[in-house]
Structure formats: structure tokens, C-alpha cells
């Protein structure tokens, strides 16, 4: 290093971070990094302990290398990336001061570095307060893609994200919620919020991974994950719950609020209540109830989580959907024994459904979704009576070929469609007074169902009416639900198109307004050009007064002209600023998803319009010209191909016609000054460039404007 550290630090655009190992600069650092370092070190230690070795770390936007070198001091192998050479110079000087550190620093762009990463090259990536600049340059979708790839090729990513509310030029480009940048990743968790030196708005820090569940007291890889509790759940819980499945664990991760505010207060409270309820039940299960062990649990302001022992087997709903053979006797028997045992201790499961039952290889059934275990005997949906709801569950076990899709349940309540002895069993319960209905009674009658009288022989007119009515109601529910789903999808598409049209109309209105303003300025400039000779004469008069050593008093016409000239200059400056802002708005529109989605539609409409305007022959000529331009451009970039083509044309005697065609399409350029001189009149040039005025007039002009 040819320069000492003092010189390198003095050359920094900003001392943004604490200078590692040099407390003399602590007071000059824009941000105190120690609080964030504690949190980053904690996550580093957790992952290092889980992997059983020091980590390979990539620090994107490393600035002065404080975090990189701090982790290197713990044994990490570090690569730091920053686009400013001055930052990298300081990092390298600090690395030279610590030769035992495995730290390398490079100048580079984050987009290019992420694109070139190989899977497993780094264990941990850090990106602190840097990706908002990339959002501003390339848009939200591109940053989402970059972060997805970063999470794919590493075990964990730590991100500090700027927010839209910060009062800076890049704020308008940011998403409404920073989680929009990472919600496509499998696992993300808020681990802290930190103030900055720029504004009082705190920035959140997230831990992200596509491979691991990353909780302070639990750090393990998962085999797969899903944001539905079971197959076919649709938009249950609005995708606010994520489920991670490891080799021997299951992790439930519930979000209490979501980007775009899609969760209502009731839905958020439901997530929180069910998770708390499940944690409470599993940490203190009733005596004799076979509950999975709790491995970890916790929460923060945005989310809560529970990691538990993985039960063997498969979901009953998956087995039914796959048409697998099941032993209904064993499944119902084991399930009833669990429900009766819970009931005796004052607990009930309010959501006994095929997707909340796990069946092992011995066809033994176990309840899951322990957040649905309550102390009030009432189902979470229709029918609210728990025994009636269990009737529906039993019907679902035997209704493999039904296509009903009801609002609440897709099987009937009555037991009369069941085969014997199952219908005899439930009909015996049906005949009991409702106040005696419970799972103990269901279990007692289940165990002697083979000896119960036939339900068919006892069926009367009331039972027949119930069968007919329930069948019709389920069919009608299915049709209404299917039509409602189709209508909802169409409404969503219409709403999206209306939003896109509104955006395009707004942009068009802005263009028209700016164009009108520019036309008004153009008229003003034209008037000034037409009266330039009069202005020159008045300036000569003013010069004569100045030579007489008399302070000239400008005639009213001159004062008015100068005022209008000054106003025109201000207007031009104002319009230039607005034009720049308009260009930025246009860029945002061009980067938007709606613009890309309507690209094909716009191109097709343009081609139809041009075909109508110019006709088929002219459009064909235009197409041929475009092809020829492409060919000429290709040959200019590839001299060897051009040389071969020219030789071939000479041999065929076609060189001169081809050259004339080339010159016709690519005329020799004229100088910019000549082109401007052909377009602008002398008077217009003098308005735009006062130095072109006659020397005497220009001298007066300078005297009149020197105090402005």
C-alpha cells in the first residue's frame, strides 16, 4: 500500500462505518455499527455452530469493511464488495494491518457479483442498507430476482432494508413494504430495527434463507416448505402461514401482518391466538395425551413460530385424494379414543378434518393442529355442534367419488348414505337426545356397532326428507361456489386492467400538460426573436448614454423586454427541471410490471395502425429497410464478414448497386453546427447564444445583466 491509512481515510467520500481497530475515528463515523454487529455476530455464531465450522461470508456493499473484518476476527473467510475504490483502498489497508485475517476486498457491482455466484461458494451473505440503490436503478422486480438468487446459493442472508418513508430521492422507487423484496423467499424473519444518521425513520433487518429455518435456538435445514396447511387449501389464511418440514421436525411460522395490509385485525389475532394456544397446549399437554415434543418457539412484532417433533405418517386428506386404501376401522377407533380422552379432561378439537389427521404405517390416526384444541365444545365452522361435525368427517371418509364443493363442508351431516355397520353406529347416536351427545358416547357405540340394529329398517319419512334436501343443498352450494370463484377471478382481471389503464391515462395527461407548457414557451421565444432588432436598437441607445457617463434610464419598452426575457429564462429553467422529472416518471412506467404485461398488446395495436395508415406495400418496404439496416450494422461490427461480402459482390458485379443502396440508407453525416445552422435562423441563434450578438450590443447586454 503506497499511501498510509490516514491519507486513505481522508480521501473517503464519507466515514460511514466505524474504522476497524482504530477508535480514534469512532467519533467521525456516520453510524455506530456495534449494535448491528452484535446481532450479526449472533447469527454468524448460530450458523457456524450448526455447520460445525467457520463460515465463508460475502459482504455486499462492505463500505469501510467494519463488519467484514469483525467476522474475519472470528475465523470467517471474507470477500467484501463495494463499487467505490476509496472504500476498497481503506479495507485493503486494514486487512494488511491484520495479516492473520482471511479477508479479500474487491471493487464491483452487486448485480454482477450475484449473477456470477456459484452455489455453496458462500455460507452467509450480508447486504446492509445497499439494495435500495439497486431498486432505484433497476426496479423492484429485478431486486427480488437478485435476492432470490442470493438466497438460493447461500445458507443465509442478512439484509438491512431502507423504507419508502425516508425523505430521499430514492424513496419513491421503494416498495410500500420492504418485505415485498423478500416475500418470495422461503424463510424470512425480522431480527431488528435500527436508526440511521440520515433520518429518524428506522430500517428493519431481516434474516433470509431458502434452505434453513433460522431461529436463535434452532438452526436446521428443511426439506421442503409450503404456504398452505394442506393440498387444496387455496388461499387459506391468505398465505400468512408457512410450514417447513425437516427430517425430524415441523416448523409453523405465522405472520401477524403482511405486505399490502392484506390481513384484517381479526385474521391477525386468529394467527396469534392459534399459535399461542398450540404452544400452551404442547408445553403442558393433558396427562395421557400423546403430544409431539416442542423444540423451539418464540415471536416478535411481525411473526411467531413453533418448532415441534415431526409425527410419522401422512395426512389423511392426501391419502383420500390419492385414492389409497385406508383402514377406516383403525383410523376412526384411534381418533375417537384421542377425542374421548381430551373430552374427559375438558378439551375439544374444534377442527377435526381429514387434513388435521395424521395416519402412520399401522393405520393409527393422530390429531394435529393443536392450536385448534379449545376448552369450549364448539366447532370452528358449520355445523358448530362437535358431534354433528364429526358426522360430516365420517361421511368424508366414505365419499371418495363425490364432487361436492360446499361453502363449509363437502359431505352431508346425516348418516344414511354410509355402509353398514357405520350407518347403524351413527344412527344410534342420532336417536339419542342432543344433550347426551359427546365423544365418550360415540366411542362406546362405535365399539359395539356390529350389534346395533339396522339403520335402514328404522328409517322413516323424516329421514328420507333429510337425505333428499341435503343432497340438493350440497349440489347447489357447489354450483354457486364454482360460479362465484369464476366471477371473482374475472373481477380480479378487470380490476388489474383498470389499474393499468388508469396509469397509462395519467401518464398521457401529464405528457399533454407538459407539451402545452412547452408550446407556450415556444410562442414566447418566437415573439422575442421577432423583436430582437428593436432590442438591439434600444441597447445601442443605452450604450450612448453610458459613454456620456450618465446612468441610463431605460425606456419602458426596453424594461418590459428585459423583464419578459428574464421571465422566459426562468420558465425555460423550470421546464427543464420538470422535463427531467417527467423523464424519471416515464422510466418508472417503462420499468413497471403493467407496462411489460401490455407490451404485446401495444405492439400489435401499433402495427395495425401503421398498416392502415401506410398500406401493405409501404410496410413491406419498411420491413426490408429494417432487415438491411440490421445486416449493415452486423457487418460493421464484424469486419471479416464485411470483407467477405464485399469480395463476393465484386465478383458478381453487384458492388456498385449495393454501395448506392448502402449510401442511400446511410448518408454521410454533416457537422452538428451545420445542421443547427440550417435549422435555426440567425436571430434565433442570437437569442439562444448572446455571444453571437454584434460586439457593441453584446457589451451592452453584459452591462445590463451583470447584476442579475
Curated annotation (Swiss-Prot):
Which BP terms in the Gene Ontology apply to this protein?
methylation; O antigen biosynthetic process
Q: Entry's InterPro entries? A: Kinase-like_dom_sf, Methyltranfer_dom, Prot_kinase_dom, SAM-dependent_MTases_sf
Outcome, altering residue 274 to A: Decrease in kinase activity
Domain of life according to the entry: Bacteria
**How does the record say this protein sits in the membrane?**
Peripheral membrane protein
Q: What is its main location?
A: membrane
Q: Which GO terms describe its molecular function?
A: ATP binding; methyltransferase activity; protein kinase activity
SUPFAM superfamilies xref list: Protein kinase-like (PK-like), S-adenosyl-L-methionine-dependent methyltransferases
What is the reaction catalyzed? 3-O-phospho-alpha-D-Man-(1->2)-alpha-D-Man-(1->2)-[alpha-D-Man-(1->3)-alpha-D-Man-(1->3)-alpha-D-Man-(1->2)-alpha-D-Man-(1->2)](n)-alpha-D-Man-(1->3)-alpha-D-Man-(1->3)-alpha-D-Man-(1->3)-alpha-D-GlcNAc-di-trans,octa-cis-undecaprenyl diphosphate + S-adenosyl-L-methionine = 3-O-methylphospho-alpha-D-Man-(1->2)-alpha-D-Man-(1->2)-[alpha-D-Man-(1->3)-alpha-D-Man-(1->3)-alpha-D-Man-(1->2)-alpha-D-Man-(1->2)](n)-alpha-D-Man-(1->3)-alpha-D-Man-(1->3)-alpha-D-Man-(1->3)-alpha-D-GlcNAc-di-trans,octa-cis-undecaprenyl diphosphate + S-adenosyl-L-homocysteine; alpha-D-Man-(1->2)-alpha-D-Man-(1->2)-[alpha-D-Man-(1->3)-alpha-D-Man-(1->3)-alpha-D-Man-(1->2)-alpha-D-Man-(1->2)](n)-alpha-D-Man-(1->3)-alpha-D-Man-(1->3)-alpha-D-Man-(1->3)-alpha-D-GlcNAc-di-trans,octa-cis-undecaprenyl diphosphate + ATP = 3-O-phospho-alpha-D-Man-(1->2)-alpha-D-Man-(1->2)-[alpha-D-Man-(1->3)-alpha-D-Man-(1->3)-alpha-D-Man-(1->2)-alpha-D-Man-(1->2)](n)-alpha-D-Man-(1->3)-alpha-D-Man-(1->3)-alpha-D-Man-(1->3)-alpha-D-GlcNAc-di-trans,octa-cis-undecaprenyl diphosphate + ADP + H(+)
Q: Where does S-adenosyl-L-methionine bind?
A: 16-17, 36, 61, 82-87, 108-111, 128
Where do transmembrane segments lie in this chain?
none
Where are the residues of the annotated region Methyltransferase?
1-210
Family affiliation: Belongs to the WbdD family.
What UniProt notes about the protein's domains is:
The N-terminal part contains the methyltransferase and kinase domains that are essential for chain termination and polymer export. The C-terminal region is required for targeting both WbdD and WbdA to the inner membrane.
Q: What is this protein called?
A: O-antigen chain terminator bifunctional methyltransferase/kinase WbdD
What species was this sequence derived from? Escherichia coli
Amino acid at each position: 500500500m503506497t499511501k498510509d491509512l490516514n491519507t486513505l481515510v481522508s480521501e473517503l467520500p464519507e466515514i460511514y462505518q466505524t474504522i476497524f481497530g482504530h477508535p480514534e475515528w469512532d467519533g467521525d463515523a456516520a453510524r455506530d455499527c456495534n449494535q448491528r454487529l452484535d446481532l450479526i455476530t449472533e447469527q454468524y455464531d448460530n450458523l457456524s455452530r450448526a455447520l460445525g465450522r467457520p463460515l465463508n461470508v460475502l459482504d455486499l456493499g462492505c463500505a469501510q469493511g467494519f463488519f467484514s473484518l469483525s467476522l474475519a476476527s472470528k475465523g470467517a473467510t471474507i470477500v467484501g464488495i463495494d463499487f467505490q475504490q476509496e472504500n476498497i483502498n481503506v479495507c485493503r489497508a486494514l486487512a494488511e494491518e491484520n495479516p492473520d485475517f482471511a479477508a479479500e476486498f474487491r471493487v464491483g457491482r452487486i448485480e454482477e457479483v450475484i449473477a456470477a455466484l456459484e452455489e455453496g461458494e458462500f455460507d452467509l451473505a450480508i447486504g446492509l442498507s445497499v439494495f435500495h440503490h439497486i431498486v432505484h436503478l433497476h426496479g423492484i422486480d429485478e431486486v427480488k430476482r437478485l435476492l432470490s438468487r442470493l438466497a438460493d446459493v447461500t445458507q443465509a442472508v442478512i439484509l438491512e432494508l431502507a423504507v419508502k418513508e425516508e425523505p430521499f430521492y430514492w424513496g419513491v422507487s421503494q416498495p410500500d413494504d420492504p418485505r415485498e423484496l423478500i416475500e418470495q423467499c422461503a424463510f424470512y424473519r425480522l431480527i431488528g430495527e435500527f436508526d440511521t444518521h440520515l433520518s429518524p425513520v428506522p430500517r428493519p433487518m431481516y434474516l433470509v434463507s431458502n434452505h434453513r429455518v433460522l431461529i436463535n435456538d434452532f438452526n436446521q435445514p428443511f426439506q421442503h416448505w409450503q404456504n398452505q396447511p394442506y393440498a387444496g387449501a387455496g388461499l387459506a389464511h391468505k398465505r400468512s402461514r408457512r410450514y417447513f418440514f425437516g427430517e425430524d421436525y415441523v416448523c409453523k411460522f405465522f405472520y401477524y401482518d403482511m405486505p399490502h395490509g392484506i390481513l384484517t385485525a381479526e385474521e391477525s389475532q386468529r394467527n396469534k391466538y392459534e399459535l399461542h394456544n398450540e404452544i400452551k397446549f404442547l408445553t403442558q399437554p393433558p396427562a395421557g395425551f400423546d403430544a409431539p415434543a416442542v423444540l423451539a418457539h418464540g415471536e416478535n412484532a411481525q411473526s411467531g413460530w413453533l418448532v415441534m417433533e415431526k409425527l410419522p405418517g401422512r395426512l389423511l386428506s392426501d391419502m383420500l385424494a390419492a385414492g389409497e386404501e385406508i383402514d377406516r376401522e383403525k383410523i376412526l377407533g384411534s381418533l375417537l379414543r384421542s377425542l374421548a380422552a381430551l373430552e374427559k379432561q375438558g378439551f375439544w378439537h374444534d377442527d377435526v378434518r381429514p387434513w388435521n389427521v395424521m395416519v402412520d404405517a399401522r393405520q393409527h390416526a393422530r390429531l394435529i393442529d393443536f392450536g385448534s384444541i379449545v376448552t369450549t365444545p364448539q366447532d370452528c365452522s358449520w355445523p358448530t355442534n362437535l358431534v354433528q361435525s364429526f358426522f360430516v368427517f365420517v361421511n368424508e371418509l366414505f365419499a371418495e367419488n363425490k364432487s361436492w364443493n360446499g361453502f363449509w363442508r363437502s359431505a352431508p351431516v346425516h348418516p344414511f348414505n354410509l355402509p353398514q355397520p357405520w350407518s347403524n353406529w351413527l344412527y344410534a347416536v342420532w336417536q339419542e337426545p342432543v344433550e347426551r351427545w359427546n365423544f365418550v358416547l360415540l366411542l362406546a357405540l362405535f365399539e359395539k356397532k356390529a350389534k346395533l340394529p339396522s339403520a335402514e329398517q328404522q328409517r322413516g319419512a323424516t329421514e328420507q326428507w333429510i337425505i333428499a334436501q341435503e343432497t340438493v343443498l350440497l349440489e347447489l352450494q357447489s354450483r354457486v361456489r364454482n360460479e362465484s370463484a369464476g366471477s371473482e377471478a374475472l373481477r380480479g382481471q378487470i380490476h388489474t386492467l383498470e389499474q393499468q389503464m388508469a396509469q397509462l391515462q395519467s401518464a398521457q395527461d401529464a405528457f399533454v400538460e407538459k407539451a402545452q407548457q412547452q408550446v407556450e414557451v415556444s410562442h414566447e421565444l418566437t415573439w422575442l426573436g421577432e423583436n430582437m432588432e428593436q432590442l438591439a436598437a434600444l441597447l445601442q441607445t443605452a450604450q450612448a448614454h453610458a459613454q456620456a457617463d450618465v446612468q441610463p434610464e431605460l425606456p419602458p419598452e426596453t424594461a418590459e423586454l428585459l423583464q419578459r426575457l428574464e421571465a422566459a429564462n426562468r420558465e425555460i429553467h423550470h421546464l427543464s427541471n420538470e422535463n427531467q422529472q417527467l423523464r424519471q416518471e416515464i422510466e418508472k412506467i417503462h420499468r413497471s410490471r403493467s407496462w411489460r404485461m401490455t407490451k404485446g398488446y401495444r405492439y400489435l395495436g401499433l402495427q395495425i395502425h401503421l398498416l392502415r395508415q401506410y398500406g401493405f406495400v409501404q410496410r413491406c418496404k419498411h420491413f426490408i429497410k429494417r432487415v438491411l439496416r440490421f445486416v449493415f450494422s452486423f457487418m460493421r461490427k464484424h469486419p471479416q464478414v464485411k470483407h467477405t461480402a464485399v469480395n463476393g459482390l465484386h465478383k458478381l458485379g453487384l458492388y456498385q448497386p449495393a454501395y448506392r443502396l448502402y449510401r442511400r440508407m446511410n448518408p454521410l453525416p454533416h457537422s452538428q453546427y451545420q445542421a443547427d445552422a440550417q435549422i435555426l435562423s440567425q436571430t434565433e441563434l442570437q437569442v439562444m447564444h448572446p455571444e453571437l450578438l454584434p460586439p457593441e450590443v453584446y457589451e451592452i447586454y453584459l452591462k445590463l445583466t451583470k447584476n442579475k
